[in-house]
A protein has these predicted regions:
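Anaerobic metallocofactor- and corrinoid-dependent redox/one-carbon enzyme cores
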Residues: 1-70, 76, 81-350
Length: 350
C-alpha cells in the first residue's frame, strides 16, 4: 500500500484512467482495498474497520419540519457519520443559511459528532457564511473534469480557492479537510465539454482537480445522469467500481452514491449489489435516503438501513465518535442496531 501511495503521487489523471481500463471488476475491488485514504473535518473518515454514510434528508419544499424528521430517523438508524447533507430546492443565500443554522442547532443540542452541509453552489455557501454568519462544516461543489465542464456548472478554480479560504478562516469545523465534491461519469459529455475524451478519463480528471483542495469527502453519483451514459445495471456497477478505484489511486477519500434513475435498466437489488461490492473494496461511505427514494432529486439510491446492514455483514463500525454517540443514545449496542433504532420520537422527548 505504501508503494502504491508513493507511486500515485506521480500519476496524471489520464494514466489513472488508463490503468483502470485494463482492470477487471475484481481487480478494481482488490486494488482499491489496499488503499486507505483518511481525512479529518470534525471527525476522521476512512480509518480501517469503519464504514460511513451521508444522511441525505432532501425535501420537495425545503420544509424545516420535514427535513428534521428525516434527520431524526436517519440518525436513529446509524446514518450520518460522514455528513448530514441536504440538496436544497431553494438555492438562495437566505434559505441556505437558514437550513445550515437549523442543522447546527440540532447538532449542538444533541451533541452529534458529525459534519453539516447544504449542497448549494460554492458562491452561495461562501456568501451565506460571510453575509449571514451561516455555520459551515463543509463547503460543497459539483465539479467536472474540464474547464468547459466546470464553466457549465458556473464554476472556476478561483471560486473554489475563495470557498476553501472562507472555510479555513470562518468554518465551524476543526479541519484541515473542509471541502466536499461530487462527480459522476458523463457530466462532461452531457455539456459537450469532453474535448473528444471518454467519460472514464474525464471522471479521473475530476479527481485530479479535487485533490488540489485536500477534500474531506468526494463521491461519484454514479447512475444519476441516466442510461444516456450508463445504460444498465452492469454499466453502473462497473462505473462505481472504476470511480472508487480511480479516486483512491488519485489519493482522495472516496465514497459513492450508488444510485440509478427511473428510466434506467436497473433496480434496487442492483444498487445493493454495487454497495456491497464497494464496501468489499474499502469504500469510505455511501448515501442514506429515506426508503432509498429521493423525493426531491427523483432518483433511487441506498436507504437508511443499508449502511447498518453492510457494517454488520462486513464487521465494520461507524466513525468512532459517532459510534459512541449511537450507543449513548441507545440506538446501537456493540455495533448492532437495537430495538430503539428507527424510533425518531426519541428526539421529540427532550
Amino acid at each position: 500500500p505504501d508503494m502504491i501511495r508513493r507511486a500515485s503521487r506521480g500519476l496524471t489523471s489520464e494514466i489513472v484512467a488508463g490503468v483502470c481500463k485494463l482492470m477487471s471488476n475484481l481487480d478494481l475491488i482488490y486494488a482499491a482495498k489496499k488503499m486507505r485514504v483518511t481525512a479529518h473535518c470534525n471527525t476522521t473518515i476512512g480509518l480501517p474497520g469503519t464504514f460511513s454514510s451521508r444522511l441525505q434528508p432532501n425535501h420537495t419544499t425545503d420544509d424545516p419540519n420535514g427535513i428534521i424528521a428525516s434527520v431524526m430517523e436517519g440518525l436513529s438508524l446509524g446514518c450520518g457519520d460522514a455528513v448530514i447533507g441536504l440538496n436544497p430546492v431553494d438555492d438562495s443565500v437566505e434559505s441556505v443559511a437558514r437550513i445550515l443554522k437549523m442543522f447546527d442547532e440540532f447538532k449542538r443540542k444533541w451533541e452529534v459528532p458529525t459534519q453539516i452541509c447544504v449542497l448549494a453552489h460554492v458562491t452561495t455557501q461562501t456568501e451565506a457564511a460571510n453575509k449571514f454568519g451561516a455555520p459551515l462544516d463543509l463547503m460543497f461543489q459539483s465539479i467536472a473534469g474540464s474547464q468547459k465542464g466546470n464553466e457549465a456548472f458556473g464554476l472556476n478554480a478561483a471560486m473554489l480557492d475563495e470557498g476553501r479560504a472562507t472555510m479555513l478562516s470562518r468554518g465551524t469545523c476543526t479541519g484541515p479537510n473542509v471541502m466536499y465534491f461530487e462527480t459522476g461519469q458523463g457530466s462532461e459529455l452531457s455539456s459537450e465539454a469532453h474535448n473528444g475524451w471518454d467519460q472514464v478519463t474525464m471522471e479521473a480528471r475530476c479527481y485530479g482537480f479535487a485533490k488540489r483542495y485536500n477534500p474531506f469527502l468526494v463521491n461519484t453519483v454514479v447512475g444519476f445522469i441516466g442510461p444516456e451514459y450508463l445504460y444498465d445495471s452492469k454499466q453502473v456497477t462497473r462505473a462505481g467500481l472504476e470511480d472508487h478505484f480511480m479516486g483512491k489511486l488519485t489519493g482522495i477519500p472516496m465514497g459513492c452514491d450508488a444510485c440509478y434513475t427511473n428510466h434506467m435498466k436497473a433496480d434496487q437489488n442492483d444498487i445493493e449489489n454495487l454497495a456491497t461490492l464497494l464496501v468489499a473494496a474499502g469504500c469510505n461511505y455511501i448515501m442514506g435516503v429515506p426508503e432509498g427514494d429521493d423525493c426531491m432529486l427523483m432518483y433511487q439510491c441506498t436507504g437508511y438501513h443499508e449502511a447498518a446492514a453492510l457494517r454488520e455483514v462486513f464487521g465494520l463500525r461507524p466513525i468512532h465518535e459517532f459510534d459512541m454517540w449511537l450507543e449513548k443514545m441507545g440506538f446501537s449496542e456493540n455495533g448492532k442496531l437495537t430495538p430503539k433504532a428507527g424510533d425518531a420520537s426519541v428526539f421529540l422527548k427532550k
